[in-house]
Curated annotation (Swiss-Prot):
One of its GO terms (cellular component) is cytoplasm. The active site is at E90 (proton acceptor), C334 (s-methylcysteine intermediate). It is an enzyme of class 2 (transferase). Its main location: cytoplasm. Disulfide bonds join C103-C334. This is Probable dual-specificity RNA methyltransferase RlmN 2.
């Protein structure tokens, strides 16, 4: 069993079944989720016999840190984790002012296969379990603790399509936001999706208050189908209706991400079409100039084209931002997460890079 399979009540029941006092449950959860201790041996206020029982029956930890790499500006750190089956996933820590945002992966690889995203080019291998998602935060929290800091925001924008691993993602959100666990406000948690309609509708009924982001990337279904194969399954009109439903039920504004690709979706006409598509919606468009990926012929638009695109949106009263690229020098920017060099393990290949501090 994994430790994340236990909430307080389940842990109390487990302790009683193994002849232990129930008050240990609060101690154990505090060690793991508040202190970031992922070793039974280091839980000093537990008896040796209890620690041995825990070690025998409950797995801890589930991720092994292979390496972490820091960007030149020291504002982005990419972590490479090995799972117990040998597969590898990545997380990114973004330092911005007082914010400490972690971009977590929800799958090994990604089934969406977006034309401009490195993760999608690698194919899909498997879903992550809730524990494997949660521990990305716990281990980075432990890494930050030496600086007296902790994770403040979580974005499900790493490897994978979160809503195609629905149960694990929702379970991880509940743990990360629970006051007795990581206590990260749901308003500081963001889930990104390419537009899995049934997942969006289901999420709107969960009673969660997380932010929802649609990876739109095109002003119409015709272009979207070309750059996002998943779009063939989900008509744009249905996706937008489900996003509206989410906004209405959760009272949360929604965000549309739009990767600008030179000569594909960056013309002023595309901007006018996008403005018409989103007219009347309480939303923000987050423009992302394409981050180059080796082997792909796609290009980032010129600054003039980006400025013109934004001007059209502003003129149509569409709130928009242009994301400042962070971590592109270490392959940690939006769309760049991928693993590029096999070392004999199963699943995705290992990232080719030099470990920070080596």
């Amino acid at each position: 069993m994994d430790y994340a399979d236990f909430d307080h009540q389940k842990l109390v029941e487990w302790l009683k079944a193994h002849g232990e006092k129930e008050f240990h449950a609060k101690q154990i959860l505090s060690w793991i989720y508040q202190k970031g201790v992922l070793s039974w041996d280091k839980m000093s206020n537990l008896s040796q016999s209890l620690r041995e029982k825990l070690a025998k029956h409950i797995r801890l930890p589930v991720l092994e840190l292979v390496r972490y790499t820091e960007s030149i500006d020291q504002e982005t750190i990419k972590f490479l984790w090995r799972l117990r089956d040998g597969n590898l996933v990545e997380s990114v820590l973004i330092l911005s002012g007082i914010r400490r945002t972690v971009c977590v992966s929800s799958q090994v690889g990604c089934p969406a296969k977006c034309a401009f995203c490195a993760s999608g080019q690698q194919g899909f291998f498997r879903n992550l379990r809730p524990t494997e998602i949660i521990e990305q935060i716990l281990q980075i929290n432990a890494w930050l603790s030496s600086k007296g800091e902790k994770v403040s925001h979580v974005v499900y924008m790493g490897m994978g399509e979160p809503l195609k691993n629905y149960e694990s993602v929702v379970a991880s959100i509940r743990v990360l936001s629970h006051p007795d666990f990581c206590n990260i406000s749901q308003r500081r948690i963001t889930v990104s999706t390419v537009g899995v309609v049934e997942g969006i509708k289901r999420l709107s009924k969960e009673g969660l208050k997380v932010n929802l982001v649609l990876s739109l990337h095109a002003p119409n279904q015709h272009i979207r189908k070309k750059i996002i194969p998943y779009a063939r399954k989900y008509p744009l009109e249905e996706i937008l209706e489900s996003m509206d439903e989410y906004a209405q039920k959760t009272k949360r504004d929604i965000t549309f991400e739009y990767t600008l690709l030179a000569g594909i979706n960056d013309h002023p006409d595309h901007a006018h079409e996008l403005a018409h598509l989103l007219k009347g919606k309480q939303c923000t468009v987050n423009l992302i100039p394409y981050n180059p990926i080796p082997g792909l012929r796609l290009k980032r638009p010129e600054k003039k084209a980006i400025k013109q695109f934004r001007s059209v949106l502003y003129g149509s009263h569409i709130v928009n931002t242009c994301r400042y690229t962070k971590g592109d020098d270490i392959g940690a920017a939006c769309g760049q997460l991928a693993l590029q060099e096999r070392e004999g393990q199963t699943g995705l290949p290992m990232l080719k890079e030099v470990a920070f501090g080596s």
